[in-house]
Amino acid sequence: LSSPSLTDCESPARAPGFRLSGSPKAEEVIMPSIIETTVYAFDELSDSAKEKALDWYREAGLDHDWFEFVFEDFERVCDLLGTEIRTVPVRLHGGGTRRKSCIWFSGFWSQGDGACFEGDYSYKSGASAAVRSYAPQDGELHRIADALAAIQRRNFYRLRARLTHRGRYHHEYSMAIAVERRGPCRQDMTGDAEEAVSEALRDLARWLYGQLEREHDHLMSDETVADAIRANDYRFTEDGAHVG
């Protein structure tokens, strides 16, 4: 006897696991796995693991605005010396604007690193005494204040200067400094006035860079970084890799 043939309307019975060619595969269900590991506090690590933990924090843990305190101090010094830092409006993420001081720096590894700023300088009575009162131990600031006072005295306290940033680098020589003598008689300033004022203001930018570099070195020191790690209770693997 011949086997019965299938008609167009009939389908063969499918055995378990049978799949027609072209039909989608069932998605595999991947179950999550749990991995247990031992974590350590900073002081429980070996010396080599501590070095790795310190390096991690130096790269990831430093606040992006760590220099704001130095900028605020610098603006205070500028005010005492008679220099008004220029500000520009910047938009806030939540709406509105705030004023941002025109102070810049780059550092601290390349030969061209430094700091610069924009603003207007003019004579301010009692600047030398005010600077000494504010920073009694800072001989460099005293020297800058005295240099500005001396050149102002020779020009009857009528010198003014405008400082603007130029180029894409940030150091004392990326500032254009225009010095002039103002007054009703339109007298010429002394021959050394422009150089003396410019050099004193560039020294002020150098002083700012030194303050930034010292603050950065302090924040990156082993002791300060270790204290920050302890305060935040960060945890690490045995070889010093951060966990979390």
Language model features by range: what are they?
Residues 1, 9-30:
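Short, Lys/Arg-enriched N-terminal segments with co-localized hydrophobic residues
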